[in-house]
Amino acid sequence: MIILGIHSHPGGHNAAASLLINGSLVASVEEERMSRIKGDSAYPAGAVAEVLSLGGLRAQEVDVVAMAGLACDKPQGLLADRVCHVIEHQLAHAASAYYASPFGDDRVGVLTLDGEGDASSGSAWVGARGCLRNVAYLPRHNSIGLLYAAVTRHLGFIAGRHEGKVLGLAAFGSPKPFLSRLAAHPHPGDALKDLCGDLPREDIAAGLQAFAEQQVCAWVQQQMAAMGVSKLALAGDVFANVKLNQRIQALPGVQSLYVHPNMGDGGLASGAAFAVHARLQGGLRPELAPVYLGTRIDRANALQALQKFDVAFEEPVNLAQAVAQLLAQGQVIARADGKMEYGPRALGNRTVMAAAHDPHINQWLNQRLARTEFMPFAPVILQEYASAYFPAWVAGQLAARYMTLTYDASELAKQHIPAAVHVDGTARPQVLGRADNPGYHDILTAYQGLTGIPSVINTSFNMHEEPIVRTAEEAIRTFQRAGLDALVLGPFLVRASAQ
């Protein structure tokens, strides 16, 4: 059965399309990557065309269209006459996490939290034997996501986009003053201006983060006890908060945690498709879904783009060793190769890399990429060394493969990769095994051989307020605009010094 999942509705964000073939997720792309409009909410015609192309299909071959959200747009064009099922917002989030998780036949607690969707701000489900059963919905007026967005806006940032900046800022403040005010007010969002008063914005951010952690962790524990589960699958924008996820993983009774890599509304398209498949087939056994599901950069289209832009390039016999040598020399290198990542995190295929031993590299990168961040850039680390740098990490913690939570850094990490460690002593690593991304792993292995350090900075390959690059042409343009030292484009190496 071929199911096309679509997320698109008026006033929404992160429209997307996903292709499910016989229960397996084979392609997923957000419309912003096609239109180059950050968080694009328009009907995802470009993303629909792209996932069908990636699947080698025509629109007429789609059996069912799965739309996410009760207020969704209708399928357009050649899809207008397809059978269409509409999936409620929180169910789509829950399905995205449950059916893409590695938990198989296990009993799982599936939790969703976001700003709002279809009049609710979260939900709890039991996942068992391939089916989801609802346990609870959270009303809109209790939304942690909306409160976080309101404070983000109050602090002068863009709500729905810059919550990560507030999270980074929180580490510089004292939580107590604002936390006590939030805890004492039954509906803090209604009196936000008065509650914030003249407090420094660092203290406001710190208090907000502490309040969110307290409220969400208490709710998670309550739901785990009610459901009798020790394994959790999470989705929804609130779970983009990596410090919150660290707290959840450390809760008593949490045996295993899976945070959906595309936890925000960009993941609703795949969730809707999963939910419809389970509805029509009487269930769907969860299986860990791939994270590289988008447009592919390969030798052919990389070469075509390089020739179009008249860019000087080389094709090293040992590309990984060549890149590692440049990194060891302090150069900053972008990598655009293979399939684009699914979700907001760069995981090696649309990535900017830099040595993390220089604490000033964050300032350099922020200037070149026109970013303003309060949290340092995240590291990627070879799996076999992860526990030495992040002692709480143990094999099998999937959330760390997708950079969806922070860890307390060891003294070794603070010495070797200070640029990746925040002022509060945490870092958000991508723990990389070779099977996850062989080419990326080879670069890191070669770098470790040269420097003795198994980790580098890994940040997304895009300019500030722009989507991550998708195509080879976009990679060349962004490389040139950012003034980076080198670009890995498929099997080719472009050096700025050679231009």
Regions found by a protein language model. Give the residues of each.
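Short acidic-aromatic active-site loops that bind/stabilize oxyanions
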Residues: 198-214, 433, 437
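Phosphate/ATP-binding catalytic cores across multiple sugar-kinase/actin-like superfamilies
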Residues: 207-232
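N-terminal phosphate-binding loop and adjacent alpha-helix
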Residues: 33-57, 216
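A mobile "lid/hinge" subdomain adjacent to the ATP/sugar-phosphate binding pocket shared
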Residues: 180-200
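Short beta-strand-loop/turn "lid" adjacent to the catalytic site in phosphate-handling enzymes
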Residues: 50-87, 95-97
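Entry/capping segment at the start of metal-dependent catalytic domains
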Residues: 1-3
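Short glycine-rich phosphate-binding loop at a beta-alpha junction
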Residues: 58-70, 227-237, 333-334
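Flexible beta->alpha loop and helix N-cap segments adjacent to enzyme active/binding sites
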Residues: 5, 9-31, 35-38, 78-182, ...
